[in-house]
């Protein structure tokens, strides 16, 4: 009787371990496309990512760089005060998108141009990663809501 209880306990523990490993693997597999790493323009220029890598870029929209193309295609540049990366985006831009304002874009860096699939724009640091906000404030370039 004791051996039967011990064997049953071992089976339950083994089954629970297998279920835990399997669920962890499934969660990791499901999240692989949802994880986007953030980079500043200076980092992108120093070490260009592979064209297949999807990541986020953040900084300020460079003054005088917005060029509207045919249809919904927009070209502009993003800067962190040290580096400047050209960006193309096809779609409708957020209402708060304008020159000298913060933005974060999701996309890929292909042939020296960041091709954005999504653009977020905000007048304060809500969508801006802390590293970029600090870098821009250090250089006196950032114009946030704190005055």
Swiss-Prot record:
What are the transmembrane regions?
Answer: 10-30
What ranges does the Periplasmic topological domain annotation cover? 31-147
> How does it sit in the bilayer?
Single-pass type II membrane protein
Question: Which residues make up the binding site for heme?
Answer: 123, 127
Gene3D superfamilies referenced in this protein's UniProt entry, alphabetically:
Nucleic acid-binding proteins
Q: Which GO terms describe its molecular function?
A: heme binding; metal ion binding
Q: Could you tell me the superkingdom of the organism this chain comes from?
A: Bacteria
Enumerate the InterPro entries for this protein: CcmE, CcmE-like_sf, NA-bd_OB-fold
Is Nucleotide-binding a UniProt keyword of this protein? no
The residue ranges for the Cytoplasmic side of the membrane come to: 1-9
According to its record, what are the GO cellular component terms? plasma membrane
> What is the annotated localization of this protein?
Cell inner membrane
Q: Name one GO biological process term.
A: cytochrome complex assembly
Q: What does this protein do?
A: Heme chaperone required for the biogenesis of c-type cytochromes. Transiently binds heme delivered by CcmC and transfers the heme to apo-cytochromes in a process facilitated by CcmF and CcmH.
Name the family: Belongs to the CcmE/CycJ family.
PANTHER family tied to this protein: CYTOCHROME C-TYPE BIOGENESIS PROTEIN CCME HOMOLOG, MITOCHONDRIAL
Entry-linked NCBIfam families: PRK13254.1-1, PRK13254.1-5
> What HAMAP family has UniProt attached to this entry?
CcmE
What this protein is called in its record is Cytochrome c-type biogenesis protein CcmE
Species of provenance: Roseobacter denitrificans (strain ATCC 33942 / OCh 114)
Per the UniProt record, the lineage of the source organism begins with: Bacteria, Pseudomonadati, Pseudomonadota, Alphaproteobacteria, Rhodobacterales
């Amino acid at each position: 009787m004791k051996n039967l209880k011990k064997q049953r306990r071992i089976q339950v523990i083994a089954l629970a371990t297998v279920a835990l490993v399997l669920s962890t693997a499934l969660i990791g597999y499901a999240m692989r496309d949802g994880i986007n790493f953030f980079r500043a323009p200076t980092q992108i220029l120093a070490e260009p990512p592979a064209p297949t890598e999807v990541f986020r870029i953040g900084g300020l929209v460079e003054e005088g760089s917005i060029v509207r193309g045919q249809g919904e295609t927009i070209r502009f540049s993003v800067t962190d005060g040290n580096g400047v990366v050209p960006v193309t985006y096809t779609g409708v831009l957020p209402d708060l998108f304008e020159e000298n304002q913060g933005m974060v874009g999701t996309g890929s860096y292909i042939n020296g141009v960041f091709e954005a699939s999504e653009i977020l724009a905000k007048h304060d640091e809500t969508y801006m990663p802390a590293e970029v906000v600090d870098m821009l404030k250090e250089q006196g370039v950032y114009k946030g809501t704190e005055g």
